[in-house]
């Protein structure tokens, strides 16, 4: 029993550690199920062995144990835990499933608007891809702007940025782009989203001015700490002249999968083209294509219907432009342009998250039904087992009130212990679930906390009602009447 209790404590501690220390969203995906399995193992071990070990320690404490109230309670609890430990562990795990499943899917549905605004920072996002440095990327920008204005919409916001976004891995002296995924040894925590862009595009998009940059000089803006000095990008070395503030607002071009993001700001578009050419020479085109991007973002006025109508016109205009510039033309640097619109994706988001909410409520109801059945069976079976013990306790001199008080305290401890442990499990799962929700563009922590609170209160109310109903049945069996 002691060994089992130690194993349970270690497993539960390991599961909690993984959940509480997860560093990024990618790690959360890989660690979530490992943490769940460890917590389940730890819960079973601690309920079956840990609880009894604690009670036996209390029994060895003579000053505590040899009191009429404590004597009967501790003795009765040892007996009850030996008989019902597995059932209580089942109730605890099922309760945790209900709390986590319902609160998560409820948050996903109520946070649709937040997710939309994070995924589509602007009403309309247009991205053009190029196989080489484009000479006039603003051509598509002008087409998109004219299309929206022709639809009768007023542009309330407009920005554009030429850039190259890459998945890189941190090295001792900088970043490696061409080596990632090519048999090199690196940790997922070293992966970073590297966005390289000209100084003028950075200033236009963020509004932050950058000092003069000479040849071989760059500025950096990173989500984590960075310093001035020399920085290597594969085979080239650059002088970091300035550290810029990392943009506080989200941008359409940021990859939510990357927990660590770095902007590398170069002097001009010619410098960007030179880096692109150098990387292209060592790039594995069969693995993934290396392209230049031109991001355009628009905010427009109008009702939801008017925005959708304008976006449909824009889609048609961009489709016609793509048809006139085939991406398989080797002489043309142009590849293709894509359009994303917030209004057109709203119904899809609500449908998807509404379906997930239904599944979450269905699974929650199913887990709850199983929990209620286990509780009801446990209470009824305990009632028949305790009937003789109830009579014996009265025969040895305990009053009816003392017997009822002792048994009632035992039942309450046994009954509410799984709920308390389930609440602790849910709190421990908070960091890792929050990371997983961030992958779905749900970063409203306050909303998730509210959903957790509402779910716990509703579940606790149902749990208490079940306790009252089954307790009445228990007392009728034991004493012949309800109390």
Segments (PLM) and residue ranges:
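Short cytosolic juxtamembrane segments of multi-pass membrane proteins
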Residues: 1, 384, 475-483
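Hydrophobic alpha-helical segments
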Residues: 1-58
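Hydrophobic alpha-helical transmembrane segments of multi-pass inner-membrane transport and secretion
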Residues: 4-6, 36-40, 84-108, 347-388, ...
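Short helix-loop junctions at transmembrane helix boundaries
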Residues: 13-31, 418-480
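N-terminal Sec/SRP start-transfer signal
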Residues: 47-95
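Alpha-helical transmembrane segments
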Residues: 50, 96-122
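Basic-flanked hydrophobic alpha-helices used for secretion and membrane insertion
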Residues: 115-129, 134-369
């Amino acid at each position: 029993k002691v060994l089992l209790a130690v194993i349970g404590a270690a497993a539960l501690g390991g599961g909690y550690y993984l959940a509480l220390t997860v560093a990024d969203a990618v790690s959360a995906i890989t660690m979530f199920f490992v943490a769940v399995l460890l917590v389940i193992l730890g819960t079973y071990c601690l309920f079956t062995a840990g609880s009894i070990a604690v009670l036996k320690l209390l029994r060895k404490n003579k000053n505590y144990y040899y009191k009429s109230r404590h004597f009967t309670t501790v003795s009765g609890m040892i007996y009850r835990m030996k008989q019902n430990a597995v059932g209580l562990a089942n109730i605890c795990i099922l309760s945790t499933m209900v709390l986590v499943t319902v609160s998560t899917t409820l948050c996903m549905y109520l946070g649709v608007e937040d997710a939309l605004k994070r995924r589509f920072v602007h009403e309309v996002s247009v991205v053009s891809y190029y196989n080489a440095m484009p000479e006039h990327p603003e051509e598509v920008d002008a087409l998109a702007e004219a299309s929206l204005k022709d639809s009768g919409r007023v542009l309330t916001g407009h920005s554009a940025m030429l850039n190259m976004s890459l998945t890189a891995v941190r090295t001792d002296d900088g970043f490696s782009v061409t080596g990632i995924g090519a048999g090199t040894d690196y940790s997922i925590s070293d992966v970073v989203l590297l966005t390289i862009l000209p100084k003028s595009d950075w200033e236009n998009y963020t509004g932050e001015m950058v000092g003069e940059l000479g040849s071989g000089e760059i500025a950096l803006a990173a989500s984590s700490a960075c310093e001035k000095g020399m920085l290597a990008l594969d085979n080239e070395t650059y002088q970091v002249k300035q550290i810029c503030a990392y943009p506080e607002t989200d941008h359409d071009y940021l990859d939510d999968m990357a927990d660590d993001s770095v902007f590398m700001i170069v002097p001009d578009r010619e410098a960007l083209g030179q880096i692109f050419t150098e990387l292209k020479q060592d790039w594995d085109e069969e693995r993934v294509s290396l392209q230049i991007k031109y991001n355009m973002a628009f905010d427009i006025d109008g009702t939801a219907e008017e925005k959708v109508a304008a976006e449909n016109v824009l889609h048609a205009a961009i489709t016609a432009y793509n048809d006139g510039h085939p991406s398989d033309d080797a002489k043309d640097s142009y590849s293709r342009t894509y359009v994303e619109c917030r209004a057109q994706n709203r119904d899809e988001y609500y449908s998807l998250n509404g379906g997930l909410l239904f599944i979450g409520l269905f699974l929650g109801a199913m887990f709850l039904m199983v929990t209620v059945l286990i509780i009801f069976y446990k209470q009824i079976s305990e009632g028949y087992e305790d009937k003789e013990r109830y009579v014996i306790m009265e025969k040895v001199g305990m009053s009816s009130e003392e017997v009822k008080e002792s048994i009632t305290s035992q039942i309450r401890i046994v009954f509410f212990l799984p709920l308390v442990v389930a609440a602790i499990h849910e709190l421990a799962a908070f960091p890792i679930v929050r990371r997983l929700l961030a992958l779905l563009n749900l970063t409203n922590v306050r909303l998730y906390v509210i959903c957790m609170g509402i779910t716990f209160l509703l579940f606790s109310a149902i749990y208490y009602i079940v306790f009252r109903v089954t307790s009445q049945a228990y007392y009728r069996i034991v004493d012949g009447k309800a109390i």
